[in-house]
Regions:
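FAD-site-proximal beta/loop scaffold in flavoenzymes
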Residues: 1-51, 138-147
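Short, mixed-charge, low-aromatic patches
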Residues: 3-12, 84-87, 163-164, 172-175
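Mid-to-C-terminal Rossmann-like scaffold of FAD/NAD(P)H-dependent oxidoreductases
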Residues: 25-127, 176-181
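Short, charged/polar low-complexity linear motifs in solvent-exposed/disordered segments
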Residues: 33-34, 111, 132-135, 158
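Short loop/turn hinge sites at secondary-structure boundaries
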Residues: 58-59, 135-137, 149
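A short, polar/charged loop-to-alpha-helix boundary motif
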Residues: 123-140
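Cysteine/selenocysteine-centered motifs that mediate thiol-based redox chemistry or coordinate metal-sulfur cofactors
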Residues: 139-181
Length: 181
C-alpha cells in the first residue's frame, strides 16, 4: 500500500508478504512525531536497509526510527541540525540558545525532553544531544548545561551517565552478535 511513500511497519514490511521497503521511497517511523512519514535522509536509509536486511534474513529486528536531520560544512563552517528547530512561537516549547564567538547552539525542549537541536561553528557533542533526543530522556536535572560549550557525558547525573554508557556498550555488543549471525 502507498500514501506519499510505501507504507511499512516497524520491521519495514510492506502490505505484501515477503516484501520490505526503506529509504527515500518508504514512510519510516519518525520517533519525534510518533508517526510514519517520508524521511529522505541517508542515515535513515542506511539503518533502515540494515534493519530490513536482518528481517529478510530471519533476524526479527525492529526499526527504531529517525527524524529530520542534517550535517554539513558550508565553506568550512560546520552545521548540525536535527528535529524541530523552528518553534520559538509555539506554545509548550522551551527554546534555549547560546552565541559565543563563532559558535551558536540552540536546543528546543518540550516537557523537559529535547525535540530539536541546531549547532553551528563548534558541533562537538551534538551526537550526545541527539542521543538524548532520540531516547526521550528527561533533561530537567541538567538542562542548563545543554547549551554550554563544555557539555558532555560528564554534565549528566551519574546514574544517567552510567546508563548511557551501558547502552553504548550493549549496542556495540549487539552489533557484533548480529554480524556473527
Amino acid at each position: 500500500a502507498i500514501n506519499r511513500g510505501i507504507l511499512i511497519d516497524r520491521n519495514l514490511k510492506t502490505s505484501h508478504a515477503g516484501v520490505y521497503a526503506c529509504g527515500d521511497m518508504a514512510e519510516g517511523y519518525d520517533f519525534l512525531l510518533k508517526i510514519n512519514r517520508l524521511l529522505p535522509i541517508w542515515p535513515a536509509a542506511y539503518i533502515g536497509g540494515r534493519t530490513a536486511g536482518f528481517n529478510m534474513a530471519g533476524q526479527n529486528t525492529e526499526y527504531d526510527g529517525a527524524t529530520v536531520m542534517n550535517a554539513l560544512n558550508y565553506f568550512s563552517f560546520p552545521l548540525v541540525a536535527a528535529g524541530l528547530v523552528n518553534l520559538e512561537k509555539e506554545e509548550g516549547y522551551e527554546v534555549m540558545t547560546s552565541l559565543k564567538s563563532s559558535m551558536y547552539r540552540k536546543i528546543v525542549l518540550k516537557d523537559n525532553r529535547i525535540v530539536g537541536l541546531l549547532y553551528t561553528g563548534v558541533v562537538d557533542r551534538a551526537g550526545i544531544v541527539y542521543g538524548l533526543m532520540k531516547d526521550g530522556i528527561d533533561v530537567s536535572a541538567f538542562k542548563g548545561e545543554l547549551i554550554s560549550p563544555s557539555f558532555g557525558m560528564a554534565s549528566m547525573p551519574e546514574a544517567l551517565r552510567k546508563e548511557r554508557m551501558k547502552l553504548i556498550v550493549n549496542s556495540h555488543e549487539k552489533e557484533k552478535a548480529l554480524q556473527r549471525a
